[in-house]
């Protein structure tokens, strides 16, 4: 168990827009992009053959699209991120409204085979005794409703243009 619940910089959601594409490009997980979104597969390929395929086919397309997007401005990068009060209840993670303490969402995560761990096991139980000063900084209504931990979330989008361009 953690020695204390980490205090987030804020509760709720924030949005960042107008991000610099050149900066963002450095953080793209290209392997996930090429395999998960673009459909490239390493199946049956050696490490060297896979690398050659990526360098010959995928990377030039990525660089061309990045250059076009920067010149034409058709990508609209946006990041939504936030922190929410949460608590574990049985096999579910409850997400509370920072303003009202109402349960906004319940998430059920799979458990590892053989009764192993689940992501929910890493969160504090509902109405657990505080580990530190979280009763002082946790949103009051959420704390009263049993929130004893914090969940950080993020969502990244590039807008609708990439899908339209890919289908063209």
Model-predicted regions and their roles:
Residues 1-168:
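Active-site loops and adjacent core secondary-structure elements that bind or stabilize anionic groups
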């Amino acid at each position: 168990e953690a020695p204390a619940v980490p205090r987030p910089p804020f509760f709720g959601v924030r949005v960042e827009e107008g991000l610099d594409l050149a900066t963002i490009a450095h953080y793209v997980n290209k392997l996930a992009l090429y395999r998960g979104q673009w459909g490239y597969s390493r199946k049956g390929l050696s490490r060297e053959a896979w690398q050659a395929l990526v360098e010959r086919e995928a990377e030039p397309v990525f660089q061309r699209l990045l250059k076009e997007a920067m010149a034409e401005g058709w990508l609209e990068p946006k990041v939504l991120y936030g922190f929410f009060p949460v608590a574990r209840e049985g096999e579910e993670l409850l997400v509370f409204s920072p303003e009202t303490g109402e349960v906004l969402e319940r998430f059920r995560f799979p458990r590892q085979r053989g009764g192993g761990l689940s992501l929910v096991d890493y969160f504090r139980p509902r109405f657990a005794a505080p580990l530190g000063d979280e009763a002082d900084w946790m949103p009051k209504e959420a704390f009263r409703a049993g929130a004893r931990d914090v969940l950080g979330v993020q969502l990244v989008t590039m807008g609708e243009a990439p899908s339209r361009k890919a289908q063209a």
